[in-house]
Every structure is written in structure tokens, then in C-alpha cells.
Amino acid sequence: MSFYFVQKPFEKYGKTLIEHVNISVEPGEHIAIVGDNGVGKTSLLNEIFKKYEDNAYLMKQDMTVYHDIIAMDYIMSLYPECLTIKKAMQYNYERIADYIALNGYEIEQRILTKAKQFNLTEHDLNQPIGLLSGGQQTKVALLRAVISDKELILLDEPTNHLDQAMLADLVQYMNKSNHTLIYVTHHRGFMNETASHIIEITNQYTRKFIGNYNQYKEIIDLEFQTQVRAYEKHQKEIKELEQTISRVKEWHYTAKQSTSVRDPIEQKRLSKLAQKSKIKATQLTQKRNDTNFEEPEMDDRHFHFNDQDVLRKRNLLRIEHFSMTMNNNPIYENAHFEIKNGENILLTGPNGSGKSLLIDIIRQRLIPDIGKVHITPSLKIGYFDQQNNNLDYDETPLNMVLDLEGMNRSHAQTILASFGFNQYKIVHAIADLSMGEKSRLQFVLLFFSNPHLLILDEPTNYFDIATQNLIMKMVQSFNGQVFIVTHDVYMQSQFKATHWEVRNKQLHNLSLKQDKKLNVNDTLRLLDDYKAIDENGHFETDN
């Protein structure tokens, strides 16, 4: 069936988000929705779902509210009667017959079979969702969407936290799917591989384009260049118009001054010329003032960071011969990791391999079962949290930015405006912001708190593409060091760093060349480091 959604205006909490929404979707179309953070993409998905609830399934991006629920139970909740009987069977075996009658075991088997396509084990499905990695949580949400088997599937940020292998599997699934798919994503590569159409959302309208993201971008770029040429032409016309106005005013002044001549015929002619010149000048001035042609905007925002205390240590941190087990599952075994002064870090690896766990060790939230952690005592770490747990939802964006050291009101407003926060949003509760806006605010707080080391865990998940480009500019101009965990291939290609990969319970430095020749100076520095080894073979604590 076809799906239509028309609303004028499109509002949320009494506030107009989009002046005019007009969306038509044909059966089997795979549509990616693009637009700035806070424009209403998630709200639009919710409203479409409400209209077509009997024929649609909505995969939500935030799994926090389900953290205490067993993953299998979350999926089985699609069949509430089955789930109720399944739980009752733990205490009353007589309900087994009812469970069989409802095809409960067949549903479970179907879930387990589909789970294999998402690299989810039965053990994973029997865990509370909160104990799963961000990528595994996304897989569970996607699995539930697939099991629902609705005609229209709405996906909110389906690529978040997914490793490259799972992303490739998702691309394959979507390209084979006969379902009608509408999804919000900021992943350019994913849109290029899966989208048959793009819907662009602005505060004024929605527009539908045939093709993937690159094809959409070509059209938008062409439109922008056309607008630039039209603006330049208009500016030239305005300049010529102003020159004409100046000449006409000069004629009027000259004619008026000359009306005192004695020849009555010449006096009449000059008086008439003065009057006409005055009228013409007024008309031309009105034409200039009535012309409203705004200069096309380009995304070219730049930021400068305050100087930081210089750290003199050769190694900011070092974790030696460490092992770690979580829920009886070994994550690391005799692994090694270090961050050298002046070195940026890119960390990759499959979902559930231990990337977030390593961050928790670096942030001293966890201690390895075995091994020793050396961190420069004066090291100031800034951490970007996937769940925005660092935000006070009752506060306003402006107040939180003003709490930063050395921040004044004018500077805070300028920074927030550069990140797309208007005067209304900066003075209202953070709880009312979209997920993307909350992430943007967290970035502002993180970058302008001047840490020595920025740890960014999946920084592009909730950002529109313009903000992603801005973030990369900020990272490249940052005075300190940056540690990024990302599955985004585009960001990986743009970020110059030492590349570490989590694989087979080890951390591998992919930037090391196996055929590297011996460097005498490097070797001497290493020997100096080894002088600090104690009798147990561990590095002594840095002072």
C-alpha cells in the first residue's frame, strides 16, 4: 500500500517545527530522511507511525528505558500474550500447553534463527539489554523490527554503534527487503548503498528526491551554485541601481538649483525635470529596499581553543599485560595499550569486543583483573558519552555553557548559535532537545572545557552531516590529543591518528610497520623507559 503524510504546520508541544509537510511513499521504496539536528526528523517518524500503527513498526534510537529487560523478552513483547505465558511457565508448567497453542516455541526459534544474521547468540539474548554493548543493543532493536514483519518499517538511526561487518549485513538485508522502509540516518555511505529516495526536511518544507545521498547532494550543490550566481547578479544590479539613484538625485539637485533662471520656458523645463528626478529617485530607492535577496549560506564555522597546560610525559598513559573478564566472558587477555604524547588514537573493532570497556579503564571507572595502569597524574580527560549522561536535563544549554571556566554570556551565545541553537532553545530545558541537539550540546561542553585528552565514543551517531563536518574541523584544530572510537568509514579516513584494533582479546597497533628499520634514537628512549621496570616486571607509577 502507499503511505501519505500531509500536515500544515507540523508542530510539537505547540511549537512549529516544519511549516508544511507533504510526504508520499510508494510500496517498496527505501527512503532516507536528512535534515539538521532538531528540525523534527524523529518527531516526524513518530507521527507517521501513529497514523499507520496497524501497518507499521518504529525502531527507536534510545534503548535506555529497556536496560533492565532481557533482550529476548523485549523482542517477544511483540507477542504480549506469549510473553505473559512464557513468564508464567517458570512457576506453572501447566501453561506449556497454552504456550504451544500460541506457537510460542516456533516464535522463539524464529527469533534465534534471525538473530544469527545479526551475529547475536542465545547467550546475548538472555542478557539484560543494559549489559550489551551499544552495537549489540542496536542489533537487538533491528532484530525486533525484522521480527515484526510490518509492511512499513521506520528506523531511527539504525547504523548507530554498528561495526563494519554488521553494517554490511544490514545493507544486504535492506537491499533484499521488500518492505517499505523510511529511516533517519547521518551515515552517508549507508544512504548511498541503500536509499532509493531522499526526503529533505527543513523548517519550511519537505522535498523528495530520486536516488541516493550522492545524487541528492549533486542536486543540492547545483542549486547552491545557481543561488550564488543569482545572488552575485542581484548584487551587481543593486550596485548599478544605487549608481542610477545617485545620478538621478544629482540631476534633481542640479535642476532644482537652476530653477531660478530668468527664462520662463527654461525655468518650467528645469522644474519639471527636478520633479521627475525626485519621483524617479524615490521609485528606485523603493525598488532597492523592497528587494530581499539573502546571500546563500555556506557551512564554514571555525573555532579556536584556549592554550592548555603542556604535558611533558612521553606517554600520557600505558596499560601493561592486562586481562579483563565481564560476566564470565574474557574480553582481554595479556593485552597492551598506550597513548604517547602528541599522538591521536583511532580505535576500531567488532561490536562487543571491548572498546567501551577500554575507555572505562582509561577513565579509571574499571580496574583490570590483571595488569597495571599508568596515567600521567595531571592528565585532564574529556569524555563524550553515547547516552548523554553528562547532561543535566533540568538545566538550559546557556546555563551549562556559562558554567565552563572563563566563559562569558556573549561567547556562550556565539558558540551555541554556531552549533545551531537558536535564542529559544538556549533558554529552555535540555530535556526538550532532540537526541542530536543533546549530543551537539555535549560536544560544546566537552570541547570548550579544554581537556588534554578528548575521548569520543561514536561521535557521529546523532549528528547531521553539516555538524559532522564541523566536528572534524574542530578535532583537526584541537590543541590537545583526541581518542576516537568509530565505525564510520568516512570519519576514519578523515582522522589522522595511530590506528589500534581490538581483535582476538588483544589490542593491535595497525600503524606499526612490520618492516620498520631499527632507529637508534627510538631504541635508546625505549631503553630509558625500561629502567623504570620493577622487580615484578611492571612499569613503576609515573610521577
Language model segments and positions:
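ABC ATP-binding cassette signature C-motif
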Residues: 1-227, 311-543
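Flexible nucleotide-interacting loop at or near the entrance of a catalytic core
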Residues: 96-106, 224-330
